[in-house]
Amino acid sequence: MVGNDILIITSLMLTRRDYKGLTWIDLESPTEQELTATATEYKIHPLVVGELTQSSQRSKVDLYSEFIYLILHFPICQIYYGQQAEGSPDTEEIDFVIGRDFLITTHYQPIVGIGEFAASFNPNHLEDRGKDKTQAGLLFYHLVRHLYGGLATGLDYINGVLKQAERKVFANQERAMVTLLAEVNRNLLDFRWALKHHREVLDSLQSASREFFDDGFHHYLGAVISEYNRIWAMLENNRETFVDLRETNESLLSIKTNETMKVFTVVAVIFFPLTLVTQFWGMNMTLPFADSPYSYYFVLALMLASLFSMLVLAKYRRWL
C-alpha cells in the first residue's frame, strides 16, 4: 500500500515501511525464515539474530559497526487494560536494531503502542533539516517517545484509581480497598521492574550514538531521557501516594478491628457474673434459698443486679 510517499508491505508477522531511503521493519514473533532474510539483507550479526529469537530478562545496548542493538522492557498497565488474570503478561520486550537508514523492531506479542504509532506515523517528523544520516535515529526517537507517552497515560490512570480509593477509604470502605490497593501495587511493581534500567541503557545509547550518528542525534536522545525522567517521577509520585494510602487504610482497618474486639471483650466481661451465678446455683450441693419458693426470683434478681452493676461499671470506665 502506498500513501504519503510511504511504501508499506505487510505479511503475517512482518510489516515493512519504506520512505525516502529509510526502512522500518516491525517483526512480531518472527519466523526463522523472516529473521534470516532480514539479517541477510541488513548484515545483522549472528549473535543478535540469536537474541532476537527469544526474550531477554534484562535491558541492554550493544554497538556494532553497522547498527546499534538495544533491548528495552515496557510495563503493561494491567489495571488500565483490565488484564488482571493469572498468567497474563506484565511486561513487554522490544528489541531495536538501529541502522543509519533502517530501524528493525522485534517483539513477541502485539504491542498497543507500536500499533498506535504506526497508524499515526507522520514521515514529516523524519525531516531533520535535510540530514539523511539521522533519519533512522529520529524514527527511533519518535517511537520511544510515543511508547513513553503511553506509559504516562497508564500512570495517570493509576493516579485516578488511587484518588478514587482515597475517597472510598474515608467512606468506610476500607475492606473493599484492600484488593484494589493490592492490584495497584502489582502494577506499580511491574512499572518499576521494567523501567529501572532504562536510564543506564539510554545513557549508554547516548554514548554509543556519538560514534554512530552525528552530534545532532545527541539532542534527540537527551529529549528521550528527559521523557523517561518524567515517567519515573510520575511512577515515584504514584508509589508514594500508594504507600501513604495503604498505611492509612491499614490504620483504619486496625482501629475498626480493635473496636470490634473491644466490644466482644466488654460483652464477655458484662456477662461473666451472670455465668458465674448460674454455674454456682447449678452445682450439685445444698445452696441457700434452694428450698425457698422464691429461689427462682432470687437468682433472677441477683443476675439482673449483676448485669446492671457491670453495665454501670462499663459506662463509668468508658468501655462502651
Task: List PLM regions with ranges.
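Hydrophobic alpha-helical transmembrane segments and their immediately adjacent juxtamembrane loops
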Residues: 43, 226-320
